[in-house]
Amino acid sequence: MTDRPHTPLLDTVDVPADLRKLKPEDLRQFADELRAEMISAVGTTGGHLGSGLGVVELTTAIHYVFDTPRDKLVWDVGHQCYPHKIITGRRDRIRTLRQGGGLSGFTKRSESEYDPFGAAHSSTSISAALGFAIANKLKDEPGRAIAVIGDGSMSAGMAYEAMNNAKQAGNRLIVILNDNDMSIAPPVGGLSAYLAKLVSSRPFLELREIARRFARKLPEPLHKAAKKTDEYARGMAMGGTLFEELGFYYVGPIDGHNLDHLIPILENVRDSDHGPVLIHAVTKKGKGYAPAEAAADKYHGVQKFDVITGEQAKAPPGPPAYQNVFGETLAKLAETDKRIVAITAAMPSGTGVDKFAKVHPDRSFDVGIAEQHAVTFAAGLAAQGMRPFAAIYSTFLQRAYDQVVHDVAIQNLPVRFAIDRAGLVGADGSTHAGSFDITYLATLPNMVVMAAADEAELVHMTYTAAEHDAGPIAFRYPRGNGTGVALPAVPQKLEIGKGRVVREGKTVAILSLGTRLAEALKAADTLEARGLSTSVIDLRFAKPLDEELIRRTLAAHEVCVTVEEGSIGGLGAHVLTLASDEGLIDAGLKLRTLRLPDMFQDQDKPELQYDAAGLNAPQIVDTVLKALRHNSAGVEEAGVRA
């Protein structure tokens, strides 16, 4: 454990009201202490470091100038919210970040009044802030709404949809564009800072508004000419023509690490009668911590690390990660199939598409944070005879559900969905859990839905998807490493809608989908030890179901239990529907379904999350015993928790 940093000024600040008592000349030291505290905390817990380091000064300035929590501060995504949490009454718990029972790694309404809106998916902040601004306006209540959004999040259409509707909020809405990738503006200097102060000042804004009103009274040709002249003049100097076209007063670019620039500009905007305003702040991800600044990913997401050296704790060697198995398998298949194309929405390394891109760069597409586009782009490719793989996290595929339905399923186009992070995901908690994809995909006509039980099955399913041209097909797999089984040298094409019997028994049957198979086998061992002959079925497909295998299994066993890493409405519901429709439970069969509970589970270690969800071997055993009307108290006597 690292020593805590010396933070005399930070120690005096528990909430932003305390920060506002500091003198302006003390803010530089305060920001340095805040940065040191954040580095120390994340070194202990792991988490998203680089983003937070890049907004230390911006966070300080916003809370210093604005009256939070009356003024609503909405962070986009939330990766950068750690400094915000430290100075909003949560410093005493900051070393519980992303731990079970600890602070969320994102903003969370139930956690603090300083988190007015929860976030973890991108590009939502402007819409939410606009809602706060308009609500205050309608209720005639004081308060501004400030949205802080990164340049990466601006690649999603939702941000522009919000900006296109923001004009009616007037000066109650302020958008701060945190440009930490230098993708929009060049490096800023003294001239940019001077211009930003000038255009954010009340006299300049009032002069511009007078000029606008005067120009509107001119004949139409002159009015348009005056408008264009104003836009071109500011566009050449400031680079904000796009935002002005959307109805914003553009201020910037400014140095997002220079408090002497940030404070007066934020004060000018706060005191202005004109708006909405967009402030363009250029920051550096990983700022102030040399190992982060030197790293290619700027320490975006890190394990626990040594604060002095920056060296991250390394996990012990083990089986390959699922996303790497997928990426490498797809790259190998693409060597002989030129129709295979890979698409990712800003997550190349997270999905394994980076492995594919290294070998086939011309057939790899990172579309940015634009899942809707990714899916329909894949649909267009499929319609023209390509074999597109849209590799998207389960939680992010939700953002493109209409495209899945309308552009893919209805047209029966063979888009392949590689669904990463299926099931519970650990430290990222409920916002990133892949809980719903079985339910929302298996309900669609034409869709095939598979779930890999281990990394070997993932190889087979990737190949099966590549060869499936009859319509859309999806295969899901979890975050983390595989189970350690040997990878097949030659992938097999699985028969669509066919499961496999892993273990034969006579009394109990466990029908598993996905990586709960390992727990199902453990449960079978325990049940066998109690004299209950147990079958284990790896169904492989949530849709179409292996109806023949299910009928045979239900008819031959006293108790059948389905197990899946998904919400209600998934595999269990489909098996129950089949059993009910065909009268398979009329003869007294005891059929039970185990799935994720009807709640959003907070962050914890995945194995503890699944234990809480009731999807580990002991809970499977207990479900069987209760169904057989055994005394469940006897479970503990057998060394199994009831």
Curated annotation (Swiss-Prot):
Keywords: Isoprene biosynthesis, Magnesium, Metal-binding, Thiamine biosynthesis, Thiamine pyrophosphate, Transferase. Its cofactor is Mg(2+); thiamine diphosphate. It is an enzyme of class 2 (transferase). Thiamine diphosphate binds at H79, A120, H121, S122, G152, S153, N180, Y289, E371. GO terms for molecular function: 1-deoxy-D-xylulose-5-phosphate synthase activity; magnesium ion binding; thiamine pyrophosphate binding. GO terms for biological process: 1-deoxy-D-xylulose 5-phosphate biosynthetic process; glyceraldehyde-3-phosphate metabolic process; terpenoid biosynthetic process; thiamine biosynthetic process. SUPFAM superfamilies: Thiamin diphosphate-binding fold (THDP-binding), TK C-terminal domain-like. This is 1-deoxy-D-xylulose-5-phosphate synthase. The lineage of its organism: Bacteria, Pseudomonadati, Pseudomonadota, Alphaproteobacteria, Sphingomonadales.
